[in-house]
UniProtKB/Swiss-Prot annotation:
The species this protein was found in: Gallus gallus
Name of the protein described by the UniProt record: Cysteine-rich DPF motif domain-containing protein 1
InterPro entries: CDPF1, CDPF1_dom
Family from the record: Belongs to the CDPF1 family.
Short name of one Pfam family: C6_DPF
Length: 124
């Protein structure tokens, strides 16, 4: 019997903002086959499909610490500042975040508008 069998997916992670879906093999802070790694938040994790190394993994996402919706770690969907926050919650509570985060969010706004405009233009 082969003891190096791939872990079976536990379920499917789906970002409630962008719709990203991927099978995850673990949810928590200490992924299997990792010796000294502890993630700072409960996360949806999958084995890294790009390497045979069992200790390598990808963090797909987590739950927003305010609204509890599942969000991916993509910069368009969430940010981590002591905890995971979805961008809608960050924007709703922007004044509660440090100035550095507020400035970072201001920088993100023009980019997202450009992306939206490009998507609309590509349809016509």
């Amino acid at each position: 019997m082969d003891s190096s069998k791939e872990p079976e997916p536990t379920g499917e992670f789906k970002c409630q903002l962008c719709g990203l879906t991927a099978p995850y093999t673990y949810y928590g802070q200490k992924p299997p086959n990792t010796h000294s790694i502890v993630i700072l938040e409960d996360s949806y994790v999958m084995k890294d499909p790009f390497t045979p190394d069992k200790e390598k993994f990808l963090i797909l996402g987590s739950l927003c610490s305010l609204c509890r919706r599942a969000v991916c770690v993509g910069a368009e969907c969430s940010l981590f500042y002591t905890k995971r926050f979805c961008l809608p919650c960050v924007n709703e509570n922007l004044q509660a975040f440090p100035l550095e985060i507020q400035e970072d969010m201001d920088k993100r706004k023009p980019q997202s508008k450009c992306l939206t405009r490009k998507k609309k233009d590509s349809r016509t």
